[in-house]
């Protein structure tokens, strides 16, 4: 408060003198002479020092001049953002005629507050200060909605700044791409008078980030045909696209292009690491290893890319070998290896020993990602005891209540069948975001507790948490698994007007499943064939085919299988299901022909298996391969003993006897 009064008194004291001809400061001359106050300002490193320099500037009668004030505001707003309050004070009280530099400085400083940014821009227009390209760039950075960027776009056109080169053109394309409006971005790009390599890169990178790899590649070929030479950013995006598409042929071509460009490109670590990642995404671990060995320089990211790549492919032996060779390991290295062993269902003791080596021997502190990796492994393999051990670690590390971890724990307990424990985790979570609510609703859905899921969905909205499209999918799944047809239809029909989401393929799939489970196959078929704005997925035709398994509608079953085979000809499920439907209605000839067609196309039935977690770890029992189990003789003896104990009490044990033999 005292400081504010001091500034105001200083302003009154020097207000009349600022207009005096004898004390008028010449900013050009003073800049050339390197005024001592400005020199001191550049060397400030604390708030108190800044106040002292400000007092000096007031003492030397520079407070009303534009240049020193612009330096003061820039220093307090940008160089040391913690002094933003002082910058605002100086701007409001001591800058009667701010120039474009001062306005840009303030707009940049308050970019986290959209309202303040646009308020400053309005003030700028009122004071007839012409904005430049930096002004519009800062405004776009503060914008979060498409409508705001479009308004800024209009102001840019009116200002004539688009004629100053490609800088603003590229910025507009970038922001439209980031907001997901590819149509407008493409139109802006098409109207650019002279697009350069940066312009093409903005489009290609935007497509690659959003997963539109084919569009990115098409634009790259247009760029080359227009005679524009790609740079390292273009090549980096191409490698990302090759990985997304698993296009090893194109990936090798890009690799060759890098090598032909010489050491400037081939020794670029960012490109080399992207190359390794691309090969792993194309499942070419041998080529990745060869490229890695050829690298003259390797950083931590290079080593981690190799470990993560082998983990993704399930080759834990190779991942461990690379891990052991690492000159230095960070948290990412340990997390990747822990995730790999957990996901593969390795012995719990192996995972725990690795965790203790990480925390006790190497003194690496685990984070949320570490815990989620361990929890996900327990969830995927149904290892409840391992999941409880990880839950204990979460509590001991004082991570309890974190929404991210709580969501993973809820998922784990639900998949292990302990829904009560999952609900307890949900209730004790101190942070409840939309992901946490969605996880609990999903768990209730898959346990057939549809009414509870709907009640929780209602409570979520009462507490002011806005559901997202994943939440709505979980609610539809809950209705489907519990036979709540009308409730599910109500949620689906109000997705747009009440929640602001257009139904996507997954939502339509859940709706079709809901109707099929309720026996309303004709309605489901009508939605798939006539009412959907997108192509039906295999899960939709699979739901319709499953609904016909009673044999009442053979024609619909045949239609569903025909459409299903167009989408996934290599899968055996449709063949087996239709064959069983024919058998149900006594059409054995058609049943046999369906099986023959399956064999003729080279489609093989994948053997099912069951998993049991024992003291020694995870055991898998594959159908028709029980005798290959290492302890089959012991298992058979115990089954025979159980059979002998049960036989005197039950009459219908013929089937069990056959299975044991």
From Swiss-Prot:
PPR repeats lie at residues 99-131, 132-163, 165-195, 196-230, 231-265, 268-298, 299-333, 334-366, 367-401, 402-432, 433-467, 468-498, 504-539. Belongs to the PPR family. PCMP-E subfamily. One of its GO terms (cellular component) is mitochondrion. Keywords: Mitochondrion, Repeat, Transit peptide. One of its GO terms (biological process) is RNA modification. It comes from Arabidopsis thaliana. Residues 616-647 are annotated as: Type E(+) motif. Residues 1-18 form a transit peptide. The keyword Translocase does not apply. Residues 540-615 are annotated as: Type E motif. GO terms for molecular function: RNA binding. It is found in: Mitochondrion. Its main location: mitochondrion. It comes from the Eukaryota. PANTHER family: DYW DOMAIN-CONTAINING PROTEIN (PTHR47926:SF492), PENTATRICOPEPTIDE REPEAT-CONTAINING PROTEIN (PTHR47926). This is Pentatricopeptide repeat-containing protein At3g04750, mitochondrial.
């Amino acid at each position: 408060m005292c400081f504010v009064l001091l500034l105001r008194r200083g302003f009154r004291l020097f207000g009349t003198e600022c207009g005096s001809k004898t004390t008028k400061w010449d900013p050009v001359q003073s800049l050339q002479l390197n005024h001592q106050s400005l020199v001191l300002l550049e060397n400030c490193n604390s708030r108190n020092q800044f106040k002292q320099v400000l007092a000096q500037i007031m003492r030397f009668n520079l407070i009303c001049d534009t240049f020193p004030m612009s330096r003061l505001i820039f220093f307090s707003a940008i160089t040391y953002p913690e002094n933003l309050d002082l910058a605002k004070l100086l701007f409001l009280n001591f800058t009667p005629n701010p120039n474009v530099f001062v306005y840009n400085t303030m707009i940049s400083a308050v970019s986290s507050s959209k309202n303040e940014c646009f308020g400053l821009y309005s003030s700028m227009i009122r004071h007839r200060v012409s904005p430049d390209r930096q002004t519009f760039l800062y405004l776009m950075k503060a914008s979060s909605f498409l409508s705001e960027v479009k308004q800024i776009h209009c102001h840019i056109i009116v200002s004539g700044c688009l004629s100053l080169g490609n800088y603003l053109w590229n910025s507009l394309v970038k922001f439209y791409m980031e907001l997901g409006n590819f149509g407008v971005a493409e139109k802006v790009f098409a109207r650019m008078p002279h697009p350069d390599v940066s312009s093409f890169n903005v489009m290609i990178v935007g497509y690659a980030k959003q997963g539109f790899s084919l569009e990115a590649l098409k634009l790259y070929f247009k760029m080359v045909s227009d005679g524009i030479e790609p740079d390292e950013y273009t090549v980096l995006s191409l490698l990302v696209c090759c990985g997304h598409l698993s296009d090893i042929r194109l990936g090798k071509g890009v690799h060759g292009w890098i090598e032909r460009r010489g050491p400037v490109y081939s020794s670029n670590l960012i490109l080399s690491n992207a190359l390794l990642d691309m090969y792993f995404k194309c499942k070419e671990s041998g080529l990745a290893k060869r490229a890695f060995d050829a690298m003259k320089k390797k950083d931590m990211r290079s080593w981690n890319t190799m470990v993560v790549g082998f983990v993704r492919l399930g080759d834990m032996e190779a991942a461990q070998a690379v891990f052991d060779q690492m000159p230095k390991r960070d948290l990412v290295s340990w997390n990747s290896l822990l995730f790999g062993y957990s996901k593969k269902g390795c012995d719990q003791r192996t995972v725990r020993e690795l965790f203790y080596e990480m925390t006790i021997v190497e003194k690496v502190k685990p984070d949320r990602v570490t815990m989620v990796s361990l929890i996900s492994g327990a969830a995927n393999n149904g290892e409840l005891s391992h999941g409880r051990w990880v839950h204990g670690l979460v509590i001991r590390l004082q991570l309890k209540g974190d929404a991210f971890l709580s969501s993973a724990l809820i998922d784990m307990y639900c998949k292990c069948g302990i829904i009560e424990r999952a609900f307890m985790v949900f209730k004790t979570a101190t942070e409840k975001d939309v992901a946490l609510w969605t996880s609990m609703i999903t768990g209730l859905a898959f346990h057939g507790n549809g009414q509870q899921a709907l009640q929780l969905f209602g409570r979520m909205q009462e507490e002011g948490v806005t559901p997202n499209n994943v939440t709505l999918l979980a609610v539809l799944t809950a209705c489907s698994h519990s036979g709540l047809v009308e409730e599910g239809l109500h949620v689906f029909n109000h997705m747009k007007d009440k929640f602001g989401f257009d139904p996507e393929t997954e939502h339509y799939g859940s709706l079709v499943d809901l109707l099929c489970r309720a026996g309303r196959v004709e309605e489901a078929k009508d939605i798939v064939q006539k009412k959907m704005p997108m192509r039906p997925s295999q899960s939709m035709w699979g739901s319709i085919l499953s609904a016909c398994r009673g044999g009442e509608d053979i024609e619909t079953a045949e239609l569903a299988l025909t459409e299903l085979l167009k989408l996934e000809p290599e899968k055996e499920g449709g063949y087996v299901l239709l064959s069983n439907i024919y058998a149900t209605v006594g059409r054995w000839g058609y049943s046999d022909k369906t099986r023959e067609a399956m064999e003729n196309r080279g489609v093989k039935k994948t053997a099912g298996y069951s998993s049991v977690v024992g003291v020694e770890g995870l055991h898998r029992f594959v159908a028709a391969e029980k005798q290959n189990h290492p302890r089959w003789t012991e298992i058979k003896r115990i089954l025979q003993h159980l059979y002998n104990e049960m036989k005197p009490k039950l009459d219908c044990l013929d089937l069990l006897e056959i299975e044991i033999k």
